[in-house]
């Protein structure tokens, strides 16, 4: 048994079909079938139920072996990375993610680390907190910046400074507004609100606060995409209530941010990372920036 056979087995378990696994592994189907048979013969157990026509499902023994095979493969990959990183130069790939509200904060750090280590490549995700946690635990990303803390035995958090939300307007829209605004005055503006798929986040906070104050907001658009929302705001389509960290650096000269008096919209971001495996040097350098 070797690492290559473990990779084959894990891929078959993920794809649930020999043909799909062979295609993903860039090899022919017969050699892959032989490798699986050799592995089963060596272990003395059947790893897959082959009686089902559409897909191969793991037997009980196969499910137990899959868990251990993944652990072994991850440890092997960690060892390879750690040895390779004994070189002084920081290189490789930095895989990180963030929620839509922390995107600008994350990208600011990514830009800093890119300037410091020009040989790095990047894999960047934007998603919901629960999905980011899954990506961390499945080792698809090394770190994430989020506004919602989800408990996990394999992930550690570092809370960052509070982030206030602000009213964001286009400089060219001509809305009469100073540097501060009261909540009771916000309904006079056409609002574009970001509404995540799961319905949580700033959207719920804003709607609950308007309801508490018996105010009727003038909502002209509910947007499910952060890039589209920012484009609409900068074009003068309407105003929005957003965390300041969500506004990209290149846009800050083209929009006007207005502080909300007695601000009820405060977010506490955190950076999170895995604790049950080796943390690649690029990820360590990324976390050091927070």
From Swiss-Prot:
The HTH lysR-type domain, residue ranges: 1-59
Tagged with keyword Transport: no
Keyword terms, alphabetized: Activator, DNA-binding, Transcription, Transcription regulation
Pfam families in alphabetical order: HTH_1 (PF00126), LysR_substrate (PF03466)
Annotated PROSITE patterns: HTH_LYSR
Any one GO molecular-function label of the UniProt entry: DNA-binding transcription factor activity
SUPFAM superfamilies: Periplasmic binding protein-like II, Winged helix' DNA-binding domain
GO cellular component: cytosol
Biological process according to GO: regulation of DNA-templated transcription
Family matches, as InterPro entries: HTH-type_LysR_regulators, LysR_subst-bd, Tscrpt_reg_HTH_LysR, WH-like_DNA-bd_sf, WH_DNA-bd_sf
Residue ranges of DNA binding: 18-37
Described purpose of this protein according to its UniProt entry: Could be a positive regulator of bsdBCD expression in response to salicylic acid.
Database matches in PANTHER family: HTH-TYPE TRANSCRIPTIONAL REGULATOR BSDA (PTHR30419:SF28), HTH-TYPE TRANSCRIPTIONAL REGULATOR YBHD (PTHR30419)
Sequence similarity: Belongs to the LysR transcriptional regulatory family.
Protein name as annotated: HTH-type transcriptional regulator BsdA
Organism per entry: Bacillus subtilis (strain 168)
């Amino acid at each position: 048994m070797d690492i290559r056979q473990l990779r084959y087995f894990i891929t078959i378990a993920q794809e649930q079909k020999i043909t799909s696994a062979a295609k993903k592994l860039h090899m022919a189907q017969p050699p892959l079938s032989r490798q699986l048979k050799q592995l089963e013969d060596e272990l003395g157990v059947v790893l897959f139920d082959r009686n089902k026509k559409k897909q191969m499902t793991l037997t009980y023994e196969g499910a137990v072996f899959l868990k251990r095979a993944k652990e072994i493969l991850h440890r092997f990959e960690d060892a390879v990375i750690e040895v390779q990183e004994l070189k002084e130069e920081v290189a490789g790939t930095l895989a990180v993610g963030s929620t839509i509200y922390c995107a600008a904060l994350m990208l600011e750090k990514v830009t800093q680390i890119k300037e410091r280590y020009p040989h790095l490549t990047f894999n960047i995700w934007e998603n919901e907190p629960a999905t980011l946690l899954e990506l961390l635990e499945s080792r698809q990303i090394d770190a994430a910046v989020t506004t919602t803390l989800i408990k996990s035995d394999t992930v550690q958090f570092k809370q960052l400074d509070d982030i206030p939300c602000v009213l964001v307007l286009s400089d060219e829209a001509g809305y009469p507004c100073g540097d501060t605004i009261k909540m009771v005055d916000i309904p006079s503006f056409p609002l574009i609100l970001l509404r995540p798929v799961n319905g949580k986040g700033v959207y719920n906070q804003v709607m609950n606060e308007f309801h508490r104050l018996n105010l009727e907001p003038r909502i002209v658009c509910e947007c499910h995409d952060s890039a589209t929302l920012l484009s609409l705001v900068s074009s003068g389509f309407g105003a929005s209530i957003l965390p300041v960290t969500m506004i990209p650096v290149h846009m800050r000269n083209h929009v006007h941010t207005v502080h909300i008096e007695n601000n009820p919209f405060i977010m506490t971001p955190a950076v999170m990372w895995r604790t049950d495996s080796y943390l690649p040097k690029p990820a360590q350098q990324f976390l050091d920036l927070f």
